[in-house]
Amino acid sequence: MKWLCSVGVAVSLAMQPALAENLFGNHPLTPEARDAFVTDLLKKMTVDEKIGQLRLISVGPDNPKEAIREMIKDGQVGAIFNTVTRQDIRQMQDQVMALSRLKIPLFFAYDVVHGQRTVFPISLGLASSFNLDAVRTVGRVSAYEAADDGLNMTWAPMVDVSRDPRWGRASEGFGEDTYLTSIMGETMVKAMQGKSPADRYSVMTSVKHFAAYGAVEGGKEYNTVDMSSQRLFNDYMPPYKAGLDAGSGAVMVALNSLNGTPATSDSWLLKDVLRDEWGFKGITVSDHGAIKELIKHGTAADPEDAVRVALKAGVDMSMADEYYSKYLPGLIKSGKVTMAELDDATRHVLNVKYDMGLFNDPYSHLGPKESDPVDTNAESRLHRKEAREVARESVVLLKNRLETLPLKKSGTIAVVGPLADSQRDVMGSWSAAGVANQSVTVLAGIQNAVGDGAKILYAKGANITNDKGIVDFLNLYEEAVKIDPRSPQAMIDEAVQAAKQADVVVAVVGESQGMAHEASSRTNITIPQSQRDLITALKATGKPLVLVLMNGRPLALVKEDQQADAILETWFAGTEGGNAIADVLFGDYNPSGKLPISFPRSVGQIPVYYSHLNTGRPYNPEKPNKYTSRYFDEANGPLYPFGYGLSYTTFTVSDVTLSSPTMQRDGKVTASVEVTNTGKREGATVIQMYLQDVTASMSRPVKQLKGFEKITLKPGERKTVSFPIDIEALKFWNQQMKYDAEPGKFNVFIGVDSARVKQGSFELL
């Protein structure tokens, strides 16, 4: 039996040798061995012990660690989240091993979305890299650091397709596109779980939020979703399935209702689709407090009814409430919930614990007690090099008039803006165990880059916002946004004075961390007025103006696009954000990021996304017609389209060549272009391939991303980029909900973004 690193564990196991030998050992991590083990264990468990396995407790004011330890002793807890130090986790696992009857280990989970202690760019930023190697880096480092803290599971990746930037949680996902979100999520699952979630430095993933949470009406958090089956399965479901096909061991159930039924009580979603059609074998976990919310949804009469509905629908674990532990015993006794249903849920929980290797070693992610870090936040535990490399790839160059960028590391540079020196905000939302004072701000990054070669003048210039209502909201639980005691005009005057003395102005503007988060939906997606006033004043100085955007959603930037000489979209870039942004500003790194989500011109354009349907009256800007699908007071397309991003060099793409004008159902067609770097710098770009089903049994999108490749070329260098197309790329869910490809013409578009493309076509026979 593997040595368990705790005196308490050794004593408790010695007291019950037969049980210990049966429960812990070198168990093969195979489905067959797992099923036999769990079946045997279930026979030994009481009803209360089974129910205890279904309870997922959040450490916090309502559940302090001391109280949780008592619950653990009584077998009332199956898993813990929101504790992230080895010492705390070890103490809780010790309680299980020393005091509970069956000694079934706990698992420990946390929201490790874009890093654990080293914070990487938010998921929108990571998606902007269009680089799966970058995703793998983030996944492996995040898993390493999470496991090194003793964690077994992460509530990630978030693969909700989002086409509404009003939604605050758009920052957590990979953007508007089904294909990109699917492949990013799949890659993240594989990277985090490694060969096995039981490995020392791997963690189990939990794909979320199932399902269609990114389509909430009005972009309003926790709102309802109503859509056709075709749209659901063509656009929103594939990323979840991709993550599960990649091996994710868990699914977090969404808070929203879908077509009138809350996901938490939707047996069609959680059983018919997830279990029966997709063959999912892992656990389903409710979102925070979602089971009790069934009463407010109006699909449960009282707490007991909510528990009955949720468990029967297929929710295995109840997060952050006591409903299962309080009401399941009575429901079992009355027969309203069967023992078979309870056993199914308990089996799923025990299965993932087995897959995590916890029945081989409950301390597998803790290591010896002597190895616990003296300083949990020690600098040596960070992965700064990897964070900087990924952050550079996440930066998108939106504008560069007259080659304003890259900047010179000489002269005088004014760095202004409320986000220029904010260590907290550069990390973004869901920054896990990241520590703000370890992050590098844009101001610090610029200072590091220029050294003594240039003079840096800094002025805050404005508050994030002067709207008291918004400030009060952002500061509801803590002082997240600090308001400068000076008047707005005094702050602008200081910034203008700095600008007048400078050769160039770098203004760092956008959103605070809390403005792009859960429960942070916005009806106005412009930069706050306080910062817009600052930008206008800086523009009036006549000095070259570079905007560095820090935000977690697309912003409406029509005016700023007119005012700025250069614009960098940096999202929330993480621990090394400031250094990475400075690398791009000064040309030490040539930007190659591309937008994973369209930027609307105004909130009135929402939703604006590239893969829309053509309609019967499509707008043609070359042949204006009043009676077409358009706005009369705004341009039809987005300000910046999906896939868009500039470089310090230029690229040309040749016409599309196809290996054949026709394709058999069991064959392939290869589409190719030749890409040339026509500029003076080495640079990378993302070549994107889109398909259009021209005529089908139902209207199909004008184009859909089906492949991409990031390439690096030296000046004058050429490269042929090829994309194989098979039948899977052509399939869709039709009106009869049959997943198939239909014969006919298909257009192929290849280019550097979704708008600038070259076209070819072939026929599926």
Swiss-Prot record:
The active site is at D287. Its main location: periplasm. GO terms for molecular function: beta-glucosidase activity. Residues 1-20 form the signal peptide. It catalyses: Hydrolysis of terminal, non-reducing beta-D-glucosyl residues with release of beta-D-glucose. It is found in: Periplasm. Keywords: Glycosidase, Hydrolase, Periplasm, Signal. GO terms for biological process: glucan catabolic process. GO terms for cellular component: periplasmic space. Pfam families: Fn3-like, Glyco_hydro_3, Glyco_hydro_3_C. Its EC number is 3.2.1.21. InterPro entries: Cellulose_Degrad_GH3, Fn3-like, Glyco_hydro_3_AS, Glyco_hydro_3_C, Glyco_hydro_3_C_sf, Glyco_hydro_3_N, Glyco_hydro_3_N_sf, Glycoside_hydrolase_SF. It comes from the Bacteria. It is an enzyme of class 3 (hydrolase). Belongs to the glycosyl hydrolase 3 family. This is Periplasmic beta-glucosidase. The lineage of its organism: Bacteria, Pseudomonadati, Pseudomonadota, Gammaproteobacteria, Enterobacterales. The gene is bglX.
